[in-house]
């Protein structure tokens, strides 16, 4: 544990480098940790505390495949939510979150879902506590100050990082660290679906909780297969750049909703619920039936799904063989398929705004053929992803920020840890 007096000492450079990978970020991370400890002391007094961390994530492969029980490849990144926390003897969890002055207090004898809390941080905390207890684990009181640099709305999964963080605290504080990363992810998903009221797949939570790269197969959606893939981007001399194209998510709900809906309509042509239950051969043999019954866009989206699903497995195979150039080619093909067939790069209801299309075009010009880019996450607005050689990062970042504004391009590393106790 660590107290303020020793906070400079207890946050060693080697620990920070191990977690955050990027040595240039060490002064920033050190300052952030010390400020978090100081904020904790302002709220709760000087104590011996523990520090926990849970990362954001980036989807690497499998664009819009999870809701059809397909496959996904996702990475945990070196942005995270951190908690400075202390165990309490009373049956209350008290949390202050950076940017919100209000203390959230959750009583452990009152963990039922509250409809009025839907969409709030309280709902996520209460949901994680309830499900952890329901699964037979010990829960107890603690107080924590939490700060996060996982950007909200930038497609890096801020809520999943938060849920993973609460689950990780409970695991280490009350269960000797024995709640598995996969179970913590499933607890987080439950909290988000049931208590927070947002239907979501399991990809975000899994990537935040497990760490490194995770390959997830959702064929059995109740018990997804999860495989951790070891991969060091730095060894290959590349960085992961996420650019916020500043496109608004407003009024895009119909566009997002149409994707799973049309894929399900294509699956319904075979009497199935989701496309994960239909083979490539079946889709190709019956394409005219899908076109007639569900329309051409549904047919194209079905073709994207079956090829994107295969691509995820090929990406995993390429990484296992350390064939990085093949991996990059597959990432590029994923992006091309999203643009051409999935069609989630701009909304056809407002063709004068195409932030993501512009970002992809500028990326390809800046990178020439040395790096690759793709839309990731939901699409239509928000962020794009690029794998950029380290020697081109400065050039790429400058070029993208000329178009999208200062700070729009975030240079990330893939971190090997999911939810962890740091100190």
Name each region found by the language model.
Residues 14-51, 79-187, 356, 363-367:
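Anion-binding (especially nucleotide phosphate/pyrophosphate-binding) glycine-rich loop
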Residues 198-297:
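Acidic-enriched catalytic cores of C-N bond-cleaving enzymes acting on peptides and small amides
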Residues 1-6, 11:
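Single conserved hydrophobic/aromatic residue that forms the stacking wall/gate
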Residues 59, 66-72, 76-78, 118-124, ...:
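FAD-binding core of FAD-dependent oxidoreductases
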Residues 91-94, 251-255, 391-398:
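Short, conserved charged micro-motifs
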Residues 43, 137-143, 148, 171-172, ...:
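Structural signature of cysteine-dependent C-C bond-forming condensing enzymes
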Residues 51-57, 61-63, 210-213, 221-224, ...:
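Glycine-rich, charge-dense phosphate/pyrophosphate-binding loop(s)
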């Amino acid at each position: 544990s660590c107290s303020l007096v020793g906070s400079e000492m207890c946050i060693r450079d080697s620990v920070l480098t191990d977690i955050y990978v990027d040595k240039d970020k060490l002064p920033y991370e050190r300052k952030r940790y010390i400020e978090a400890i100081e904020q904790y002391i302002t709220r709760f007094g000087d104590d011996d505390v523990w520090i926990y961390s849970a990362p954001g994530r980036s989807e690497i492969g499998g664009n819009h495949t999870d809701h059809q029980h397909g496959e996904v490849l996702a990475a945990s990144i070196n942005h995270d939510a951190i908690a400075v926390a202390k165990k309490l003897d009373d049956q209350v969890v008290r949390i202050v979150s950076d940017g919100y002055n209000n203390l959230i207090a959750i009583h452990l004898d009152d963990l039922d879902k509250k409809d009025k809390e839907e969409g709030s941080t309280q709902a996520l905390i209460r949901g994680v506590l309830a499900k952890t207890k329901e699964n037979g684990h010990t829960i107890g009181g603690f107080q924590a100050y939490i700060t996060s640099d996982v950007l909200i709305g930038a497609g890096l999964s801020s809520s999943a990082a938060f849920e993973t963080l609460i689950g990780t605290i409970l695991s280490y504080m009350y269960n000797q660290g024995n709640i598995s990363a996969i179970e913590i992810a499933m607890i987080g998903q439950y909290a988000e679906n049931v208590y927070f009221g947002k239907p979501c797949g399991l990809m975000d939570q899994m990537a935040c909780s497990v760490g490194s790269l995770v390959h997830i197969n959702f064929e059995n959606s109740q018990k997804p297969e999860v495989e951790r893939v070891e991969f060091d981007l730095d060894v290959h001399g590349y960085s992961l750049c996420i650019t916020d194209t500043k496109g608004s998510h407003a009024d895009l709900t119909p566009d997002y909703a149409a994707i799973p809906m049309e894929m399900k309509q294509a699956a319904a042509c075979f009497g199935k619920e989701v496309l994960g239950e239909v083979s490539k051969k079946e889709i190709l043999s019956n394409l005219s039936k899908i076109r007639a019954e569900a329309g051409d866009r549904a047919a194209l989206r079905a073709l994207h799904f079956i090829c994107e699903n295969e691509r995820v497995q090929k990406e995993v195979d390429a990484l296992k063989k350390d064939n990085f150039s093949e991996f990059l080619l597959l990432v590029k093909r994923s992006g091309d398929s999203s643009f051409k067939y999935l069609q989630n790069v701009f909304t056809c209801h407002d063709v004068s705004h195409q932030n993501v299309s512009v970002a992809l075009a500028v990326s390809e010009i800046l990178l020439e053929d040395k790096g690759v880019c793709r839309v990731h996450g939901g699409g239509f607005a928000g962020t794009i992803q690029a794998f950029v050689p380290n020697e081109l990062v400065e050039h790429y970042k400058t070029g993208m920020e000329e178009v999208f504004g200062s700070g729009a391009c975030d240079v990330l590393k893939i971190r090997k840890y999911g939810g962890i106790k740091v100190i």
